[in-house]
Amino acid sequence: MSLRVAVVGAGPAGIYASDLLIRNEDHDIHVDLFEQMPAPFGLIRYGVAPDHPRIKGIVKSLHTVLDKPKLRLLGNITVGRDVSIDELRELYDAVVISTGAVRDRELLIPGGERSIGAGEFVGFYDGNPRFERGWNLSAQQVAVIGVGNVALDISRVLAKTGDELLATEIPDNVYESLKTNQAHTVHMLSLIHISEPTRPY
């Protein structure tokens, strides 16, 4: 039995879902993979700090999936604007939604409206074409709220000079902007207590 499936979102989840579908042995499944950006890979392309080339190496394995003949990548298409979910349901036997986390959460504290979300800043330094390039980086002290991987990446990028970032995969236009970075102190604020792990004796 031959089936046509639409997968919305060409990040890692969408690509791996597509791979599982086209490798199905019970059905002959062909996948159209819709992506709103011009290029695939989602946060692997636009959410990893430029000084993490090993993580970006995952792109190579994702490329092998995209090269399979039963999969067609359709970029620059925003589902909900260019084509509706209802239209996809009419055209395909199934629709898989794998759009991921697309927005920063609002910081609901006094002065929160002056904050910049992690996704917005990461999109900037990774060269995502949908994000602003002309950042004001004149602050000498910066606070990063959070101590997770993304917060560490942002803090590390802000703590480096433009020249230190030049040896990474940073896009040229982002490098030019980050050369103006005046931050000399980056404070990381945690909402949880951080302590040494308890060791059993």
Language-model features: locations:
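Glycine-rich dinucleotide-binding loop and its adjacent helix/turn
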Residues: 104-180
